[in-house]
């Protein structure tokens, strides 16, 4: 037997073994991907370092009150990429809603110029009339969520005293099951301002419900996911009346086109009881809301949610001990004007969709 034949035969055997291994690994990977992980994260004033004419963003420049320079900017992007990677674990985050980002360039720097670049993420960003330039974004894996349409939905101020607010981002995409998922990313008006801000949140909630109802009438099998910083918690009236949300855990007869809150009374480790801490009290300001169709766990082959699907993400590296030594709080970037060098004043929330 010639040496050439032996060499070729050995190469052929290695090729067959390698091919079989890759086919097995691919098949196993496909079998394991019968779910997708969704994350929502308010990232606390993720601005670039440049002043944009017409926007009140001068504080977040190198000479502004926060001394927001390139070193701090890139350090924060690196920290955020660590959070996103850790939240995905063995299964990367498929859909990521980012709240409190300034513009497209910030999100593109995050997904293309940090450790996340390997994932191949793409993004859609709102373009709001907010005076500070605050926007929201949806980051997605294009092979898991094929973009169908996108729209930055304007919420017109009601009355002369109300200023423009953040747009609602609506993104429709096709899942690996062939189903269409309509995603709404929102950032409701701040709680500052008392009764006036409450009225504004009511107005945004009513606009959002109108947009969602229109889509649910248009789709034959609607799958709706609303997520973001609502700046409010159950059972405030803008949720129960303006948006018409019910609690998923207490709804005996779930209706396909009604909306259900998944993020009531979430608990994390280290006695964490919400996504935001104010004056020593935890508040659940960040939420996931879905339509009733997605609560049907008999929909094998289509997106559905289990009772354990939704949770806080609160690893210790995202937390900092209170000055009193009792309890913890989110490890934020700034405390007032003091630079702490942390991650965000909010904690992320996670949701697993199953097929």
What is each stretch, according to the model?
Residues 210, 214-224, 232-355:
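Metal-dependent phosphoester-hydrolase catalytic domains
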Residues 105-108, 132-135, 192-196, 233-238, ...:
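Extracytoplasmic/secreted cell-surface and envelope-processing proteins
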Residues 101-180, 184-189:
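Structured beta-strand-rich core segments of catalytic domains in phosphoester-bond hydrolases
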Residues 54, 176-210, 236:
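Metal-dependent phosphoester/phosphodiester hydrolase catalytic core
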Residues 44, 102, 189, 230-233:
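Catalytic metal-binding/acid-base residues of hydrolase active sites
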Residues 30-114, 124-136, 322-328, 352-355:
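N-terminal, active-site-proximal structural segment of metallo-dependent hydrolase catalytic domains
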Residues 62-71, 92-98, 125-126, 157-158, ...:
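Second-shell loop/turn segments in exported
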Residues 1-33:
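Bacterial Sec-dependent N-terminal signal peptides
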